[in-house]
């Protein structure tokens, strides 16, 4: 006989064997109702030639029956259908599988089974390729071989020893790197000796065409004669400088002032000044040329260029702290040590300083806040004293000692500072280490994959039957997760679960799917289209 399935498409005629399948499942025939096809006792041979025998089972009604007449598989939502594996035909008439639309007009809308509701967790956006590579690197961050591999390959212990040594080495390098970063923030200087050379040359006056030359005075020189003049040179260099790069002499100073005799050169022409500007170009020395044939007393005022800047303390505060000229940070540190040593910090209000008699004389107050100290200290700081050198410019041709040398202390950058900066800025070693880490991670991942394959093959060779059964069970669980058909494993393991009415429909659908599959295969082989 022929009938219709739950989806509204025609079912194939049942053969006597098909009835035997339904009877074997133990499904009793449903009671007759509206829209139900007559049983075998009420019908004869159908037009399709199918014969309904005693073993043939009738299908449930497909007409507009009430909700009570619909059989529902446990664990499936109303209106949902069983997926049929291998069914490649077009969608049957009616609603598609898995939709919430009613199967027939007039049927109530389907609702999801509350036991199968799941929390809809919003999925994150798929990572970009760069982010995906970063996640992969983070997943492979553990370079330790698993214990099972170490037991399988005893030689891998050498790799683990190297890994432990590398971890200690990385910790040591990281600690030293942090120490270098902290040290490079502070001024790293060395005290060196700078030797200053002060020399002068004298050019006597000469008449035109006269090779002998005569000495004259500025007032009595003829108009055509060459005026007598002298030239003063100030140069210098570092003593025992190990660096190959020579530093310019002017780079040590902020300003240089040469004060000549005011009685000889007047109040407007007796000063020669040089001050550092942002656009100043460094030079190896200074030279001054003036007319004159008399000895000149001059004073050189050299202001050192301290980096960071240094300041001279008020004499009262300098005697109290024992600091004469220092940087602002060093002065603040010395001041705090004095406050801490003399217990001047207020015991209750810690942000206040109780001034002793010396502080009251210097800061002119009996109590001040910590935040007020920099402002109070600014009025007590002065520019450091310049280096004063007195020199006599000699114009006597018989005086052989015309060069004077003076040694002064200067601060220069520690050569280690440049090396530390280059070490921190260098990325060559880091790139090489990163590339080697990637290779190690890839090797460890390959070893883990090979170990998994070995376990797979070893389990199969040990007990093929149990292995295949366990593998099928695992694949079955994965298939349920992929197809979103979870069901109830506890019910499915019992025989009564398969004696329910929905099993008849499942068998019919399976047979129909197989028939359609065979039909397509036959059409492909014969190259015809059966109608």
From Swiss-Prot:
<protein>
    <recommendedName>
        <fullName>SWI/SNF-related matrix-associated actin-dependent regulator of chromatin subfamily D member 2</fullName>
    </recommendedName>
</protein>
<feature type="modified residue" description="Phosphothreonine">
    <location>
        <position position="217"/>
    </location>
</feature>
<dbReference type="Pfam" id="PF02201">
    <property type="entry name" value="SWIB"/>
</dbReference>
<feature type="cross-link" description="Glycyl lysine isopeptide (Lys-Gly) (interchain with G-Cter in SUMO2)">
    <location>
        <position position="226"/>
    </location>
</feature>
<dbReference type="GO" id="GO:0006325">
    <property type="term" value="P:chromatin organization"/>
</dbReference>
<dbReference type="GO" id="GO:0005654">
    <property type="term" value="C:nucleoplasm"/>
</dbReference>
<dbReference type="GO" id="GO:0006357">
    <property type="term" value="P:regulation of transcription by RNA polymerase II"/>
</dbReference>
<keyword id="KW-0597">Phosphoprotein</keyword>
<dbReference type="InterPro" id="IPR003121">
    <property type="entry name" value="SWIB_MDM2_domain"/>
</dbReference>
<dbReference type="GO" id="GO:0003712">
    <property type="term" value="F:transcription coregulator activity"/>
</dbReference>
<comment type="subunit">
    <text>Component of the multiprotein chromatin-remodeling complexes SWI/SNF: SWI/SNF-A (BAF), SWI/SNF-B (PBAF) and related complexes. The canonical complex contains a catalytic subunit (either SMARCA4/BRG1/BAF190A or SMARCA2/BRM/BAF190B), and at least SMARCE1, ACTL6A/BAF53, SMARCC1/BAF155, SMARCC2/BAF170, and SMARCB1/SNF5/BAF47. Other subunits specific to each of the complexes may also be present permitting several possible combinations developmentally and tissue specific.</text>
</comment>
<feature type="domain" description="SWIB/MDM2">
    <location>
        <begin position="306"/>
        <end position="383"/>
    </location>
</feature>
<feature type="modified residue" description="Asymmetric dimethylarginine">
    <location>
        <position position="104"/>
    </location>
</feature>
<keyword id="KW-0488">Methylation</keyword>
<dbReference type="GO" id="GO:0016514">
    <property type="term" value="C:SWI/SNF complex"/>
</dbReference>
<keyword id="KW-0539">Nucleus</keyword>
<dbReference type="InterPro" id="IPR019835">
    <property type="entry name" value="SWIB_domain"/>
</dbReference>
<dbReference type="GO" id="GO:0005634">
    <property type="term" value="C:nucleus"/>
</dbReference>
<keyword id="KW-0156">Chromatin regulator</keyword>
<comment type="similarity">
    <text>Belongs to the SMARCD family.</text>
</comment>
<keyword id="KW-0804">Transcription</keyword>
<feature type="modified residue" description="Asymmetric dimethylarginine">
    <location>
        <position position="81"/>
    </location>
</feature>
<keyword id="KW-0832">Ubl conjugation</keyword>
<feature type="modified residue" description="Phosphoserine">
    <location>
        <position position="203"/>
    </location>
</feature>
<dbReference type="InterPro" id="IPR030090">
    <property type="entry name" value="SMARCD2_SWIB_dom"/>
</dbReference>
<comment type="function">
    <text>Involved in transcriptional activation and repression of select genes by chromatin remodeling (alteration of DNA-nucleosome topology). Component of SWI/SNF chromatin remodeling complexes that carry out key enzymatic activities, changing chromatin structure by altering DNA-histone contacts within a nucleosome in an ATP-dependent manner. Critical regulator of myeloid differentiation, controlling granulocytopoiesis and the expression of genes involved in neutrophil granule formation.</text>
</comment>
<feature type="region of interest" description="Disordered">
    <location>
        <begin position="205"/>
        <end position="227"/>
    </location>
</feature>
<keyword id="KW-1017">Isopeptide bond</keyword>
<keyword id="KW-0805">Transcription regulation</keyword>
<dbReference type="InterPro" id="IPR036885">
    <property type="entry name" value="SWIB_MDM2_dom_sf"/>
</dbReference>
